[in-house]
Protein backbone atom coordinates (compact mmCIF):
# COMPACT_ATOMS: atom_id res chain seq x y z
CA UNK A 1 0.00 0.00 0.00
CA UNK A 2 3.03 2.26 -0.24
CA UNK A 3 1.95 3.54 -3.65
CA UNK A 4 -1.40 4.81 -2.31
CA UNK A 5 0.36 7.63 -0.47
CA UNK A 6 1.00 9.25 -3.86
CA UNK A 7 -2.48 8.60 -5.27
CA UNK A 8 -4.87 9.49 -2.44
CA UNK A 9 -3.87 13.19 -2.15
CA UNK A 10 -4.95 13.59 -5.79
CA UNK A 11 -8.54 13.07 -4.64
CA UNK A 12 -8.22 15.97 -2.20
CA UNK A 13 -7.21 18.60 -4.77
CA UNK A 14 -10.23 20.91 -5.06
CA UNK A 15 -11.90 21.67 -8.34
CA UNK A 16 -11.59 25.33 -9.42
CA UNK A 17 -14.63 27.54 -8.83
CA UNK A 18 -14.42 29.11 -12.27
CA UNK A 19 -16.22 26.81 -14.77
CA UNK A 20 -13.86 27.95 -17.54
CA UNK A 21 -10.99 26.19 -15.75
CA UNK A 22 -12.72 22.83 -15.28
CA UNK A 23 -11.51 21.46 -18.62
CA UNK A 24 -7.90 22.47 -17.94
CA UNK A 25 -8.10 20.99 -14.46
CA UNK A 26 -9.52 17.68 -15.68
CA UNK A 27 -6.89 17.44 -18.44
CA UNK A 28 -4.07 18.14 -15.97
CA UNK A 29 -5.38 15.58 -13.49
CA UNK A 30 -5.92 12.99 -16.20
CA UNK A 31 -2.41 13.42 -17.60
CA UNK A 32 -0.94 13.38 -14.09
CA UNK A 33 -2.68 10.10 -13.26
CA UNK A 34 -1.75 8.54 -16.59
CA UNK A 35 1.90 9.52 -16.24
CA UNK A 36 1.94 8.33 -12.62
CA UNK A 37 0.48 4.96 -13.56
CA UNK A 38 2.95 4.53 -16.42
CA UNK A 39 6.03 5.69 -14.52
CA UNK A 40 5.53 4.29 -11.01
CA UNK A 41 3.51 1.18 -11.97
CA UNK A 42 1.55 0.83 -8.71
CA UNK A 43 0.49 -2.62 -7.57
CA UNK A 44 -2.85 -3.96 -8.73
CA UNK A 45 -4.47 -3.66 -5.31
CA UNK A 46 -3.50 0.01 -4.95
CA UNK A 47 -4.71 0.81 -8.46
CA UNK A 48 -8.04 -0.92 -7.81
CA UNK A 49 -8.51 0.83 -4.45
CA UNK A 50 -7.79 4.21 -6.05
CA UNK A 51 -10.11 3.57 -9.02
CA UNK A 52 -12.87 2.43 -6.64
CA UNK A 53 -12.46 5.60 -4.56
CA UNK A 54 -12.49 7.74 -7.72
CA UNK A 55 -15.61 5.96 -8.98
CA UNK A 56 -17.43 6.44 -5.66
CA UNK A 57 -16.56 10.14 -5.50
CA UNK A 58 -17.71 10.72 -9.08
CA UNK A 59 -20.81 8.55 -8.70
CA UNK A 60 -21.95 10.35 -5.55
CA UNK A 61 -21.73 13.78 -7.29
CA UNK A 62 -20.10 15.52 -4.35
CA UNK A 63 -18.71 18.09 -6.74
CA UNK A 64 -15.08 17.11 -6.27
CA UNK A 65 -14.89 14.74 -9.24
CA UNK A 66 -12.36 16.11 -11.71
CA UNK A 67 -13.64 14.05 -14.65
CA UNK A 68 -16.94 15.90 -15.11
CA UNK A 69 -19.36 18.22 -13.35
CA UNK A 70 -22.65 16.75 -12.19
CA UNK A 71 -25.49 18.90 -13.47
CA UNK A 72 -27.61 18.09 -10.42
CA UNK A 73 -25.11 19.51 -7.96
CA UNK A 74 -25.28 23.30 -7.63
CA UNK A 75 -22.25 25.53 -7.75
CA UNK A 76 -20.97 26.82 -4.42
CA UNK A 77 -22.28 30.23 -3.35
CA UNK A 78 -18.84 31.75 -3.76
CA UNK A 79 -18.81 30.76 -7.46
CA UNK A 80 -21.27 33.57 -8.23
CA UNK A 81 -19.15 36.20 -6.51
CA UNK A 82 -17.62 38.44 -9.22
CA UNK A 83 -14.59 39.22 -7.08
CA UNK A 84 -13.64 35.53 -7.02
CA UNK A 85 -14.63 34.42 -10.52
CA UNK A 86 -13.24 37.45 -12.30
CA UNK A 87 -14.68 39.24 -15.30
Swiss-Prot record:
Pfam family, one: BC10
Cellular component aspect of the GO annotation: cytoplasm; membrane; nucleus
Keyword DNA damage part of the UniProt annotation: no
Family: Belongs to the BLCAP family.
Function: Acts as a tumor suppressor; induces growth arrest at G(1)/S checkpoint and apoptosis via RB1-dependent and p53/TP53- and NF-kappa-B-independent mechanisms. Modulates expression of genes involved in the regulation of proliferation, cell cycle and apoptosis.
PANTHER family: BLADDER CANCER 10 KD PROTEIN HOMOLOG (PTHR13259), BLADDER CANCER-ASSOCIATED PROTEIN (PTHR13259:SF1)
Designated name of the protein: Apoptosis inducing factor BLCAP
Lineage: Eukaryota, Metazoa, Chordata, Craniata, Vertebrata
